[in-house]
């Protein structure tokens, strides 16, 4: 988004792969430094970031309808029959295409994983962690749905947004529907919020790595699991994740398909990890499971079955390329 903003202000500027790589590495190093601070400092930063994200989201939801200009040929808001129709950008049937679009939803809704990654660092975790999971999924889902409605009723040409030379659909959409200065203001707010979100992801990932290293799952677990004496946080795990992340960023030089596949692979890995304990609890442990103070009661088993069924359906779907048949080439395979 930062490079897209630069391209908007200077149409002659075209970001190169190495510029994208270096900027991303620079941001990741900043996130690593913040995530290496003491827990109290990180908590304050994340509380500020979470509040900023919620405020920013509601500001954007209000600003977009208020700023959409429209033209003589296009209305400010499109009619519901057009909004609620399926615009299939793949060569698969509409049903499959809709399921393939869930990749964005999966990543958006996966924010609920942070509370259980950080449960060891909060008081009254048996209640605080599940409450945070429910609030994250509920508030994020409803607010995200509201934003999607705003976008759906105002976007002019979806193919132009996706295929824009900016390489950033959100930036392309904003430029398409509103004046440039307002679009840049909203894009800037989004960048700040995304920066805060990225730091939260770094913290959550480092705690997962620390937990696995503590159980001896990695070859270098003896080093990764060390807790810094000054900050009382798993600093080594933070920088181990940072090194792995920088290595993965090298896929940028392999093209958009190569780096884009990370999102599908990451979604598959994350949701398989989430589903394994749900599957074991639902189909093997059953009534022997000892419930905590926060539970789903009689709805636990049917919800667990639905969760497992959803993952079974989505795993192969997330591996599908957007084209098939003679149009499918090795370069387009994930």
Where are the model-predicted features located?
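TM-loop-TM module centered on a large, flexible mid-protein loop between adjacent transmembrane helices
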Residues: 4-8, 83-85, 132, 138-199, ...
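C-terminal membrane-solvent junction of multi-pass transporters and transport-like membrane proteins
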Residues: 19, 48, 222-232, 274-333
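Helix-loop-helix connectors at the membrane interface of multi-pass transporters/channels
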Residues: 1-22, 116-125, 134-139, 198-237, ...
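Lipid-exposed faces of alpha-helical membrane segments in multi-pass integral membrane proteins
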Residues: 22-33, 48, 52-62, 139-146, ...
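Transmembrane helix-loop junctions in multi-pass membrane proteins
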Residues: 34-39, 182, 244-261, 286-287, ...
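Juxtamembrane interfacial secondary-structure elements that flank transmembrane helices
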Residues: 1-10, 62-79, 146-165, 203-220, ...
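Helix-loop-helix junctions that connect adjacent transmembrane segments
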Residues: 12-19, 51-178, 183
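Membrane-interface loop-to-helix entry segments
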Residues: 21-79, 110, 133-137, 263-274, ...
